Amino acid sequence: LNRDRFLNKKQRDAAHAMLEAGADILDIGGESTRPGATTITPEEEIARVIPVVRELAKAAPVSIDTRNAATMRAALEAGAEVINDISALRHDVEALAVVRGSHAPVILMHMPGDDPATMQSLATYDDVAVQVTDFLAERIAACEAAGIPRGRIAVDPGIGFGKTIDHNLALID
């Protein structure tokens, strides 16, 4: 979502078209995570996503795509049911506590570093599949140690996030 802070007709129609096409959940994010993207403050992110989460949560389950604990908390209160964090709960020290204190499932994604602006410069692996697997196993262990049950944890290898085309192909092979 951009800084407009509301769903325009095109976005609303796209969300409903996705649901009609069979989408089970809508993933809403207010901060671009493309390589080299500029970060925004949690306050700006909250202003962008919360009205949209409130609206779309009436029609379908919503996932909040954020690295920020304050946004996670606000989105859950607004009706989001899942937390999707590209930093695997590493970016914000309060994120583990927010997830633990909720009943929401969490998606942990692999990305080298915790900043989309620099992730592509860190795309160096000896064995991408082993290193991504090890990273995700460590993050699962950190979640479990923080009191988040394994049954609430899903993982995402982060295709396209801090990886070359060859890395991406190795992960899906």
Residue locations for each model-derived region?
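Conserved anion-binding
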Residues: 1-4, 32-36, 59, 72, ...
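Short, acidic/polar
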Residues: 9-18, 67-70, 135, 139
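Catalytic domains of carbohydrate-active enzymes, especially glycoside hydrolases
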Residues: 13-29
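Alpha-helical segments flanking ligand/cofactor-binding loops in enzyme cores
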Residues: 16, 47-50, 54, 73, ...
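Conserved, mostly hydrophobic/aromatic
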Residues: 18, 22, 65, 75, ...
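Glycine-rich, proline-tolerant flexible connector loops at the mouths of alpha/beta enzymes
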Residues: 24-51, 159-165
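Active-site beta->alpha loop and helix N-cap motifs at the rims of alpha/beta catalytic domains
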Residues: 36-76, 80-82
